[in-house]
Amino acid sequence: MMRGGMGNMNNMMKQMQKMQKQMAKAQEELGEKQVEGTAGGGMVTVIANGHKQILDVKMKEEVVDPEDIEMLQDLVLAATNDALKKAEELSNATMGQFTKGLNLPGGLF
């Protein structure tokens, strides 16, 4: 009886190590994936990766109006929030495969 228990424990440890490697690989791949957030009908675009890091900000020339800096700030903010929301969704979809069935507090993956 003890022997079977130890075998099960070893199998469980191997499965956990395998899952840990898969999670590390998925995390690494998240950093390579990119999402795009936009605002103003594409006037401002923000690129982020799956780690929620902003990689690039692009804006069309016509959106840059020295008389209305506030509008540009609002568009950059909206595009950034859109990109970060998409990065969060990507992260949840990618890492969620490892945590489904576990009752973990929100925001961990």
Swiss-Prot record:
Keywords for the protein's UniProt record, in alphabetical order: Cytoplasm, DNA-binding
Family: Belongs to the YbaB/EbfC family.
Name the UniProt record assigns to this protein: Nucleoid-associated protein Bcer98_0019
GO terms under cellular component: bacterial nucleoid; cytosol
Domain of life: Bacteria
Higher taxonomy: Bacteria, Bacillati, Bacillota, Bacilli, Bacillales
Any Pfam family the entry gives: YbaB_DNA_bd
Keyword Membrane applies: no
Compartments, as annotated in UniProt: Cytoplasm, Nucleoid
GO MF terms held by the record: DNA binding
Oligomeric and partner information: Homodimer.
Purpose: Binds to DNA and alters its conformation. May be involved in regulation of gene expression, nucleoid organization and DNA protection.
